[in-house]
């Protein structure tokens, strides 16, 4: 099953690294929520897997998320691509 296998955060750079198990050639969407209820916001979509595992780095300030006390992430398979 799809699951996040790596989460790393740097306070200095405001970067978060997300890694997950993936299927070669599949596409994925990374979504975020501030309340675990609303998952309408994408960090990125149409991410093509890197193979059996995939990871991406995001700068939270690029999305206005660096000042929030908590942010939650999830990865979904993008079956539209």
What are these model-derived regions, one by one?
Residues 1-81:
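Short, composition-biased motifs enriched in small/polar/acidic residues
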